């Protein structure tokens, strides 16, 4: 379990001193794992994916990420889970962010708000939820634990795709005429992040047959 000390300015400043990274980015990454643990504690069934997932998957993640991306089965009733997770320390409220969808893909987005010890104002972590039957070749259980967060007692675990499965997923970002990001769509930073993740995953992937599948 995550210790309450994670959510203090002292801990964030310690991380800043050790890594020379932006304190707000460090803070938001730590609080993202607080949100991940919160939705796990309330029993929400989900698969954890996306850039922040790599911070659990990789022994030494190469970049920080601050959003939580999950997949849930179609028809999952999220409201009670989200409401209860939003009450767990250090969070203070939840607000659904309504976006216009495309390609008939069912998604919901939530801003989960906390009091920032670094900025001394309210900031949110974004929870992106995709409703679909997961198509990953292989899933693994991973404890919520990495070099940024302090833990105590038994670690909660989450289901995540294998390195090879998430690499295959990330590669779809470069299929702009199907499931990926359209070129010249003012999303250069998103493409760069995906490319960086792909390069990192290629270095540790072992079974490229699984990537293709």
What are these regions (language model features)?
Residues 36-68, 72-74:
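Active-site nucleotide-donor binding segment shared across nucleotidyl transfer reactions
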């Amino acid at each position: 379990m995550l210790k309450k000390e994670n959510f203090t300015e002292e801990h964030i400043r310690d991380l800043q001193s050790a890594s020379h990274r932006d304190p707000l980015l460090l803070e938001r990454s730590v609080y993202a794992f607080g949100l991940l643990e919160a939705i796990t504690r309330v029993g929400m069934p989900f698969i954890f994916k996306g850039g922040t997932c790599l911070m659990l998957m990789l022994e030494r993640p190469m970049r920080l990420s601050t959003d939580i991306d999950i997949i849930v089965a179609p028809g999952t009733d999220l409201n009670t889970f989200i409401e209860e997770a939003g009450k767990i320390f250090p969070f203070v409220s939840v607000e659904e962010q309504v976006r216009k969808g495309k390609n008939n893909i069912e998604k919901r987005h939530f801003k989960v708000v906390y009091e920032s010890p670094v900025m001394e104002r309210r900031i949110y972590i974004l929870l992106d939820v995709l409703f679909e039957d997961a198509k990953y070749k292989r899933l693994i259980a991973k404890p919520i634990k990495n070099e940024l967060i302090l833990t105590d007692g038994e670690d909660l675990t989450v289901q995540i795709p294998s390195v090879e499965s998430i690499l295959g997923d990330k590669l779809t970002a470069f299929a702009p005429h199907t499931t990926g990001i359209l070129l010249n769509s003012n999303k250069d930073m998103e493409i760069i992040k995906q490319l960086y993740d792909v390069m990192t995953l290629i270095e540790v992937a072992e079974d490229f047959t699984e990537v293709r599948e």
